[in-house]
């Protein structure tokens, strides 16, 4: 997605503040779970932490438009396509998980057998709310901020690491915690790939995938009760599906790029190389603007020179015309004076001849 860039200092500080506030609020809210009276598998109040952290960062830092660029509620064909994928991928993951249980264990353990004393609609509403609060903070806000400086793939890795640290569960030992970390990391990577190139329309896709995954776990697996085999199956199934999905996505984009002869930016507006050429583009634009200004100055200077030369030539031609007119006047006056003198001489001769003839007549 293309947005106005925030400064590097604000970028790093925003990520740091978001992480610290999220972790601190999670520790604080965890102590209030029992007092609220809602079971954790229905609604975990620690999921409010990333939502509150995002609100705090939006209020505390400038460039509000850039910070909210990842939260758009409009829907287009690409969003619908990704929502369908967000429903299909959890189904594939849990089909692999159930096949693994049937192959490597006697049967999969249902959480319903021990602790499902809440109506299904209540669980659905609770998981939708948890998904919204968590994904608003991590995907619609944090992923958008991280993508402001790095490309989508590495942004998904950074957000995935932060998300996995926030969701870490060390209650049931280190092996369980390791598989849980792998699961949450690949969970986040898949969402990052699903929301790629959606131009900020992320919340629907992330919410559907998150709610589908968490809702199915309540009924099919008992990883939340500390069952290591359940956690291992979920983690490995999610990792397998995530790797295949990312590879297929890369292959499809590469095929589209080759068959249409378009640039990667045209094929995928927010692709892996999206932010790599921004500095070069900025530099080239600045260079072009400077060249344009220089050419404008040069053209204006040339035009002024031409105008000055034209004025000078015009004045010279006018001077030449005036001088030629003066010469013509002088020649004309000279000719008139000469003509008048000749006429006077002729008149004098005629008068003399008349006088001579009159004298002869008298004699």
Swiss-Prot record:
Keywords: Cell membrane, Cell wall, Membrane, Secreted, Transmembrane, Transmembrane helix. Residues 269-363 are annotated as: Disordered. It is a multi-pass membrane protein. Its main location: membrane. It comes from the Bacteria. InterPro entries: Rce1/LyrA-like_dom (IPR003675). One of its GO terms (biological process) is CAAX-box protein maturation. GO terms for cellular component: plasma membrane. The chain crosses the membrane at residues 9-29, 41-61, 83-103, 118-138, 153-173, 175-195, 202-222, 232-252. It is found in: Cell membrane; Secreted, Cell wall; Cell septum. Residues 287-315, 324-363 have a biased composition (Basic and acidic residues). GO terms for molecular function: endopeptidase activity. Belongs to the LyrA family. Involved in bacterial cell envelope homeostasis. Regulates peptidoglycan processing, perhaps acting as a scaffold protein. This is Lysostaphin resistance protein A. It comes from Staphylococcus haemolyticus (strain JCSC1435). The lineage of its organism: Bacteria, Bacillati, Bacillota, Bacilli, Bacillales. The gene is lyrA.
């Amino acid at each position: 997605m293309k947005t106005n860039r925030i400064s590097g200092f604000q970028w790093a500080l925003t990520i740091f503040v978001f992480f610290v506030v999220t972790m601190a609020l999670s520790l604080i809210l965890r102590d209030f779970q029992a007092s609220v009276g809602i079971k954790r598998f229905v609604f975990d109040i620690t999921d409010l932490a990333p939502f509150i952290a995002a609100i705090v960062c939006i209020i505390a830092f400038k460039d509000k438009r850039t910070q909210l660029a990842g939260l758009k509620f409009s829907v287009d064909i690409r969003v619908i396509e990704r929502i369908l994928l967000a429903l299909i991928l959890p189904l594939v993951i849990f089909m692999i998980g159930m096949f693994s249980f049937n192959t490597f264990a006697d049967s999969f353990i249902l959480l319903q057998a021990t602790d499902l004393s809440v109506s299904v609609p209540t669980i659905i509403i609770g998981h939708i709310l948890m998904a919204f609060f968590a994904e608003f903070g991590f995907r619609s806000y944090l992923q958008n901020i991280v993508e402001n400086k790095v490309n989508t793939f590495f942004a998904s890795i950074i957000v995935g690491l932060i998300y996995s640290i926030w969701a870490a569960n060390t209650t049931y030992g280190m092996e369980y915690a390791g598989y849980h970390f792998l699961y949450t990391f690949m969970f986040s990577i898949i969402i990052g790939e699903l929301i790629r190139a959606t131009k900020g329309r992320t919340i629907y896709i992330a919410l559907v995938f998150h709610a589908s995954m968490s809702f199915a776990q309540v009924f099919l697996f008992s990883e939340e009760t500390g069952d290591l085999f359940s956690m291992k199956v979920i983690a490995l199934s999610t990792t397998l599906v995530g790797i295949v999905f990312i590879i297929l996505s890369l292959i499809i984009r590469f095929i589209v790029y080759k068959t249409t002869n378009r640039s990667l930016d045209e094929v995928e507006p927010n692709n892996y190389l999206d932010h790599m050429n921004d500095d070069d583009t900025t530099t080239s634009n600045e260079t072009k603007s400077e060249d344009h200004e220089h050419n404008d100055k040069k053209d204006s200077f040339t035009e002024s020179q031409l105008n000055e030369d034209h004025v000078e030539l015009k004045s010279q031609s006018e001077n030449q015309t005036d001088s030629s007119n003066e010469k013509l006047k002088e020649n004309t006056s000279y000719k008139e004076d000469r003509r008048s003198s000749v006429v006077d001489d002729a008149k004098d001769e005629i008068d003399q001849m008349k006088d001579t003839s009159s004298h002869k007549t008298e004699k």
